[in-house]
Curated annotation (Swiss-Prot):
The modification Phosphoserine is found at S653, S965. Residues 647-669 have a biased composition (Basic residues). Belongs to the WD repeat L(2)GL family. Coiled coil: none annotated. Keywords: Cell cycle, Cell division, Cytoplasm, Exocytosis, Phosphoprotein, Repeat, WD repeat. It is found in: Cytoplasm. The keyword Cell cycle applies. It comes from the Eukaryota. Residues 647-688, 939-975, 992-1019 are annotated as: Disordered. It comes from Pongo abelii. This is LLGL scribble cell polarity complex component 2. SMART domains: WD40. InterPro entries: Lethal2_giant, LLGL2, WD40/YVTN_repeat-like_dom_sf, WD40_repeat_dom_sf, WD40_rpt. The lineage of its organism: Eukaryota, Metazoa, Chordata, Craniata, Vertebrata. Phosphorylated at Ser-653 by PRKCI. Phosphorylation is enhanced during cell polarization induced by calcium. Phosphorylation may occur during the cell-cell contact-induced cell polarization and may contribute to the segregation of LLGL2 from the PRKCI/aPKC and PARD6B/Par-6 complex.
Length: 1019
């Protein structure tokens, strides 16, 4: 009975916990997954994007962002922002309409759904009778005109969504008002286009799919003009002055129609097939925009020659003799053009083209010669190459920050200098208190550096490791280059490139030292690169060293992929991070753990075969250690051929079933232990009903060495601690494996004045075997004050107190199943905490975080942030290992999201909710990136962006986020993750990137290795 009862709560501690811990999902970084609709408000200067999962996202100035999620999770097919209002209407693929509003609450705007409506037909009518194809918000903001597949146009009153049946424009009524010769030439079919007259709100244009276009007088209920085309109509555009119509058609042509009072049925002024004369694909949308200079812009989507370029996704711009077909690597969803916002203006004067593709957003500067792209301050295509790992570094020194930005600015010379043109709303969030970096490794061998200081994720710099290796492609190849006489005049735009030249280039581990500027990256084929930040371009040879992890083993044969061939001579590297040494592991298996100690100039690396230590100052190998067990034969087969035998799979399955039956016999059969005990306590002692029950700890069973790859190196950790005796501390390297083994090596690092003359020596000092053989996921040493040891060079830069070396040190080992504290140097067990409460729970990520109090500026505590395979996040105290709070963060079915999670040094975190989006969350009350912004409908912006130094960075972007404290449930409907993760395709797409072979399934995504992260860089 006693073991189920937890001692009474300490009210002081509970109050302090409320000051330290609070769970929030704050913002989603990146590009919306599977976009399906685009909208724009010229008056508010707000862009809207809808997705197939039912989410809508609004973007304005950097830091201004809103998100909403339809309850039905149906695809958004159209978005229309009401003119001059903070309202928008969405159409879903289930034929429902939804009205959303931006309302001010507490001094900030929030996006809320006000009404929903489904158009109903008369009893017995076919579904096509009311299937909406086009939505036209009237300029009065009081009416919606709805074109349907039946050819009828229905009218709905806003904001109540009340159908006005007496105002319906039926196809029969239109037919009766047409001249006799036009009545029999066309079958109406569906409505393809609805447009309001730019100057007269009493006239609307109705375009039918078979080619008939009519101008309808709303007051007189009559046809003013009608136009007949011989081709199927796709879309239509009404010139700003109302004197010209431009229609586009299914054969790749467009026609210009004059609006003349002399003829009720005008003939086309001009009909043109821009990419003819051969058969072309349909032009699905066209804009004809006037300018003060007199020459219009013609911008259209599609129309490419069907035979040769039918697979291209293009949006074309024609102006003043210049024609360019912007070629995208993913399907174009829609586009819009930013023009003069005042509807009474005489000219459109377009200045920017905004194209929404399936995998990215591209903005083109139409004011600058050559029409260069504009750099995005948000909506970055994180998955331009698939993300394979992530690494977060907090509190970057200003000097390093400026050097990274300077290196990145040289890569952005091809971008326009135009200020970001979508600048509606006002961000109310203060500037971030520090500079943070999020580094993402990619399948194509690149590492991207993102400004993660606020909620507006911005690309600073891109590093490519491809130049080091011999590949089939030329790294200097310019994909956007084309000949002057080439036709069609294609130009590649955008950054999305889903194809990798060689999967072995993929980055698996990243470790950045923010004080020295050293960077270590490791890849899929056993390559470990050490790089140094250089402000100037350099041509240099990369020194190559081979690390044979099987040198003492016989009878093993690697069956996986080959190593990457590297350049033997000098290679030119641009300013930025430049590699100077390549350590090639043999066999060339995936690097599973990485650690860098820039003060000692050492880098440690681990694979499924063992680990090694390399001195990157003297360019020599210190030692290698093979960790293979005789049963680890599969570790030599490689990720492409690693398949477990059916016999072994069945044997292990039956073994688990037997264990489950045995353990179930030992428990009471009436349900979970906590529930059973709670019922018995209430029955026996009513007075104890309000006492809290301690969770039942699951029994930890010893694992067989055949259960997993026991030699798989999960984590590496450097520490200056007491390893041999309590009188003298020394540098050390710790390694934890998948079989529950911890290796400790004492290191002799020469002093700085003799560093190049004497060699680093290593000697194995200890080997610890955990009884339950669970994989070791984290190692940490605590000083005499039970505080984690500081980062390398952190004390030298006066950013941390010197560790307490005279006191007794403690070793914390975190396995998948328990936390255990040992005393040093004797390594005797002192404390332990088993992972509790739920059967099958395993530690997946663990990191040390500093939690500051929101009330007392000078008070803070170090704790462990722990993510389990069930998606729960727990905070565990140091050094007493007492659970503090637990939150439900990621769905347990989202294996890929759990695998991609990284923690920060101050209690925040990131994980992938789709291949292109990170969800950001916070566990801290103090370090909370809280986005707030304001959009005012009365504030109509008519200014045009000028050319400056590029987009100005704002500190944050806004999303309404729900707060979840311990024990509370998440607010429904606001998190896009719920919609995305209900789609199995999304989960499989992330999982295919982040989960490789069986041996690296749980560890290929690099966790945050900053500050006191356990295993500093390893898994």
């Amino acid at each position: 009975m006693r073991r189920f009862l937890r001692p009474g709560h300490d009210p002081v501690r509970e109050r302090l916990k409320r000051d330290l811990f609070q769970f929030n999902k704050t913002v989603e970084h990146g590009f919306p997954h599977q976009p399906s609709a685009l909208g724009y408000s010229p008056s508010l200067r707000i862009l809207a994007i809808g997705t197939r999962s039912g989410a809508i996202k609004l973007y304005g100035a950097p830091g201004v962002e809103f998100m909403g999620l339809h309850r039905e999770n149906n695809a958004v097919t159209q978005i229309h922002l009401l003119p001059g209002q903070c309202q928008l209407v969405t159409l879903l693929d289930d034929n429902s309409l939804h009205l959303w509003s931006l309302k001010v609450k507490g001094g900030a705007s929030e996006l809320q759904e006000d009404e929903s409506f489904t158009l109903r037909g008369p009893p017995g009518a076919a579904p096509s009778a009311t299937q909406i194809t086009v939505v036209l918000p009237h300029s009065s903001c009081e009416l919606l005109y709805l074109g349907t597949e039946s050819g009828n146009v229905f009218v709905v009153q806003l904001p109540a969504f009340r159908a006005l049946e007496d105002r319906t424009i039926s196809s029969d009524a239109v037919l009766q008002r047409l001249p006799e010769e036009a009545r029999h030439r066309r079958v109406f079919e569906m409505v393809e286009a609805l447009q309001e007259h730019p100057r007269d709100p009493n006239q609307i244009l109705i375009g039918y799919s078979r080619g008939l276009v009519v101008i309808w007088d709303l007051q007189g209920s009559r046809v003013l003009y009608h136009f007949l085309s011989s081709q199927q109509l796709e879309n239509i555009w009404w010139q700003r002055d109302g004197r010209l119509l431009v229609s586009c058609h299914s054969d790749g042509s467009y026609c210009q129609w004059p609006m003349s009072s002399e003829a009720q049925q005008p003939e086309p002024l001009r009909s043109l097939v821009p990419y003819g004369p051969f058969p072309c694909k349909a032009i699905t949308k066209i804009l004809w925009l006037t300018t003060r200079q007199g020459l219009p812009f013609t911008i259209f989507q599609g129309g490419m020659p069907r035979a040769s370029y039918g697979d291209r996704h293009c949006t074309s711009v024609i102006h003043d003799g210049q024609q360019t077909a912007f070629d995208f690597t993913s399907r174009v969803i829609d586009f819009t053009v930013l023009t003069e916002a005042d509807p009474a203006a005489a000219f459109d004067d377009p200045y920017a083209l905004v194209v929404l593709a399936e995998e990215e957003l591209v903005v083109i500067d139409l004011q600058t010669a050559g029409w260069p792209p504009v750099q995005l301050p948000y909506l970055a295509s994180l998955h331009c190459s698939a993300i394979t790992c992530s690494h977060h570094v907090s509190n970057i020194p200003l000097k390093l920050w400026e050097r990274i930005i300077a290196a990145g600015s040289r890569q952005n010379a091809h971008f326009s200098t135009m200020e970001w043109p979508i600048d509606g709303g006002t961000s109310l969030t203060p500037a971030p208190p520090q500079r943070d970096l999020l580094l993402t490794g990619h399948e194509d061998g690149t590492v991207r550096f993102w400004d993660a200081s606020g909620v507006c994720l911005r690309l600073l710099y891109k590093l490519s490791t491809v130049r080091v290796f011999l590949t089939d492609t030329d790294p200097n190849e310019n994909l956007s280059a084309h000949g002057e006489d080439e036709w069609p005049p294609l130009r590649k735009v955008g950054s999305f490139d889903p194809y990798s030249d060689d999967p072995r280039l993929g980055i698996q581990k990243i470790f950045l030292c923010k004080y020295s500027g050293y960077l270590a990256v490791a890849g899929t084929a056993g390559q470990v690169l050490v790089l140094e930040l250089n402000d100037e371009a350099a041509e240099q040879a990369v020194e190559q060293v081979e690390a044979d992890l099987l040198q003492d083993q016989e009878g093993y044969r690697w069956k996986g992929h080959e190593r990457l061939a590297a350049h033997s001579g000098p290679v030119r590297f641009e300013p930025g991070f430049q590699p100077f040494v390549l350590v090639q592991c043999q066999p060339p298996a995936v690097v599973t753990s990485l650690a860098l100690h820039s003060e000692w100039r050492l880098v440690a690396f681990g694979t499924s075969h063992g680990f090694g230590l390399f001195d990157h100052q003297q360019r020599r190998q210190v030692f290698v250690k093979c960790t293979l067990h005789p049963s680890d034969q599969l570790a030599l087969e490689g990720p492409l051929s690693r398949v477990k035998s059916l016999k072994k799979s069945l044997r292990q399955s039956f073994r688990r079933m037997r264990r489950s039956r045995v353990s179930s016999r030992k428990r009471r059969p009436a349900g979970p232990p906590g529930e059973v005990q709670e019922g018995s306590v209430k029955a026996e002692r009513p007075g104890l009903q309000n006492m809290e029950l301690a969770p039942v700890q699951r029994k930890i069973e010893a694992r067989s060495v055949e259960d997993s790859f026991t030699g798989f190196v999960r984590t590496l950790y450097f520490a200056d601690t007491y390893l041999r005796d309590s009188s003298r501390h020394c540098p050390s390297l710790w390694a934890g494996t998948n079989g529950g083994t911890i290796y400790a090596f004492s290191l002799r690092v020469p002093p700085a004045e003799r560093r190049m003359d004497e060699t680093v020596r290593a000697e194995q000092a200890k080997e610890i075997q955990l009884m339950h053989r669970a994989p070791v996921v984290g190692i940490l040493v605590l000083d005499g004050h039970s505080v984690p040891l500081p980062e390398p060079l952190e004390v030298a830069h006066d950013l941390s107190k010197s560790p307490d070396m005279p006191g007794s040190h403690q070793l914390l080992v975190v396995s998948e199943e328990q936390f255990k504290v040992f005393t040093l140097p004797k390594v005797s067990a002192k404390l332990k905490l088993k992972l509790t409460a739920l059967e099958g729970s395993r530690v997946r990520r663990v990191s040390v975080a500093h939690f500051g109090s929101r009330r007392a500026e000078d008070y803070g505590e170090h704790h462990l942030a722990v993510l389990t395979n069930l998606g729960d996040i727990q905070v565990v105290s140091l050094p007493l290992l007492k659970p503090q709070v637990r939150y439900s963060c990621i769905r347990r079915e989202d294996v890929s999201g759990i695998a991609s999670c990284v923690f920060t040094k101050y209690g925040q975190g990131f994980y992938l909710i789709s291949p292109s989006e990170f969800e950001r969350f916070s566990l801290s009350t103090k370090w909370l990136v809280e986005p707030r912004c304001l959009v005012d409908s009365a504030e109509t912006k008519n200014h045009r962006p000028g050319n400056g130094a590029g987009p100005k960075k704002a500190p944050s972007r806004v999303r309404n986020s729900g707060t979840q404290s311990d024990g509370e449930e998440k607010q429904p409907g606001l998190v896009m993750e719920r919609a995305l993760l209900s789609d199995e395709r999304v989960l499989k797409e992330i999982q295919s990137t982040l989960e490789g072979d069986r041996g690296s399934r749980n560890w290929r995504s690099h966790r945050a290795a900053v500050g006191c992260s356990l295993g500093n860089g390893g898994e």
